[in-house]
C-alpha cells in the first residue's frame, strides 16, 4: 500500500439503541464500504483482504457489537495491529445516549435489550455501559444521540466525516425509453412523448439526442421551450427542499418512447441547467438500443 491508497476506517460502536444502524446508513451515503456486526476477531483478516484487494476500497465503516468481554481482548489486539499499519487511518466513533432515552427507545420499538432479553431494559443498559467504559475512553469521537432525531444524527455524521465534495447534494438526470420500462430508482419521472418525434424523419432515425441535428430539432419547437421553462422552474424549486430533508441524491428520469431522441435531448438540457448549482451526473439508459420507437 502507498500513501495514495490510504484507507480511512471508521469503527462504529457504542450503546445498543444509540443509533448504529442510522450511522451505518449515513456512512454508506458518503460512499463508505459498510459491514455491520463484524466480530472483532475477524478485523485483522478483513484488513488483510483490504490490503490485497485491487479495488478502490479506500473508505470503510465497520459496525462492531461488543457484548462479551472476550470480544474486547480481540478488539484491543486488532486496534494495536492497525496502529502499526501506516496505510490505514482508523477512527472509533462511539454512540451514546442517556439511560432514560435508551429505555424510551426500547419501549417504543418493543425490543428487548440484548443484555437483558427477559428483564428490564435499564438492567441491560447498566450492564452494557459498564462493559463499554474502556471502549468509550479510547474512542476518537463520542457522539451523544439523546436529543438527535435520525435525520439530525445523519447530518451530524456528514458534518464530521465528509469532505466538501461528499457533502454535495447529487442530482442524477437520466433519459430512458418507456418501451423498456420506467427506471426503478427514479424519484421523479417526466414523460416527454408529447413532443415532436425526430424518429419519423428518416435521416434522424439512427441518430440520438446527443447529435446536434437531433437536439436542435427537438429544441426548436415552442412546446419544448414552454415545457423546459416549467420543468426547470419546478426542479429548481424542489431541489433545495429535498436537500433540506436529508436526501443525499435525487434521480430525475425523463422518458420518451425509445429513449434515443427527445428524452436524451431534454436530459442533456436539464443537466446543463443544473450544473452551476449542483453536482450533476447525466446518463442515457437506453440510447444504444436501436430497436425503434
Curated annotation (Swiss-Prot):
- Would the keyword Lipid metabolism turn up in this protein's UniProt record? no
Any GO MF annotation of the entry: ATP binding
- Which keywords appear in this protein's UniProt record, sorted alphabetically? ATP-binding, GTP-binding, Nucleotide-binding
Q: What does this protein do?
A: Displays ATPase and GTPase activities.
UniProt-listed InterPro entries:
P-loop_NTPase, RapZ-like, RapZ-like_N, RapZ_C
From what organism does this protein derive?
A: Bacillus cytotoxicus (strain DSM 22905 / CIP 110041 / 391-98 / NVH 391-98)
Sites binding ATP sit at 14-21
Q: Which family does it belong to?
A: Belongs to the RapZ-like family.
One Pfam annotation, family name? Answer: RapZ-like_N
Protein's name in the database: Nucleotide-binding protein Bcer98_3698
Q: Where does GTP bind?
A: 65-68
Amino acid at each position: 500500500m502507498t500513501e495514495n491508497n490510504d484507507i480511512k476506517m471508521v469503527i462504529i460502536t457504542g450503546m445498543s439503541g444509540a443509533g448504529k444502524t442510522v450511522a451505518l446508513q449515513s456512512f454508506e451515503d458518503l460512499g463508505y464500504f459498510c459491514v455491520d456486526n463484524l466480530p472483532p476477531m475477524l478485523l485483522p483478516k478483513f484488513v488483510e483482504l483490504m490490503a490485497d484487494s485491487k479495488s478502490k476500497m479506500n473508505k470503510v465503516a465497520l459496525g462492531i457489537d461488543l457484548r462479551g468481554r472476550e470480544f474486547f481482548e480481540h478488539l484491543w489486539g486488532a486496534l494495536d495491529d492497525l496502529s502499526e499499519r501506516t496505510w490505514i487511518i482508523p477512527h472509533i466513533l462511539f454512540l451514546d445516549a442517556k439511560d432514560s432515552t435508551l429505555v424510551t427507545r426500547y419501549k417504543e420499538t418493543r425490543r428487548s435489550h440484548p443484555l437483558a432479553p427477559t428483564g428490564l431494559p435499564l438492567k441491560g443498559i447498566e450492564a452494557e455501559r459498564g462493559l463499554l467504559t474502556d471502549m468509550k475512553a479510547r474512542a476518537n469521537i463520542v457522539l451523544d444521540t439523546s436529543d438527535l432525531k435520525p435525520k439530525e444524527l445523519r447530518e451530524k455524521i456528514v458534518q464530521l466525516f465528509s469532505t466538501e465534495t461528499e457533502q454535495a447534494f447529487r442530482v442524477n438526470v437520466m433519459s430512458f425509453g418507456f418501451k423498456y420500462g420506467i427506471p426503478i430508482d427514479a424519484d421523479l419521472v417526466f414523460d416527454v412523448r408529447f413532443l415532436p418525434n425526430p424518429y419519423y424523419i428518416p435521416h434522424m432515425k439512427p441518430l440520438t439526442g446527443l447529435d446536434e441535428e437531433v437536439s436542435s430539432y427537438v429544441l426548436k419547437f415552442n412546446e419544448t421551450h414552454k415545457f423546459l421553462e416549467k420543468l426547470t422552474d419546478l426542479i429548481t424549486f424542489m431541489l433545495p427542499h429535498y436537500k433540506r430533508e436529508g436526501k443525499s441524491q435525487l434521480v430525475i428520469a425523463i422518458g420518451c418512447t425509445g429513449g434515443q431522441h427527445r428524452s436524451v435531448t431534454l436530459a442533456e438540457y436539464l443537466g446543463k441547467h443544473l450544473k452551476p448549482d449542483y453536482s450533476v451526473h447525466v446518463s442515457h439508459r437506453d440510447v444504444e438500443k436501436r430497436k425503434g420507437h
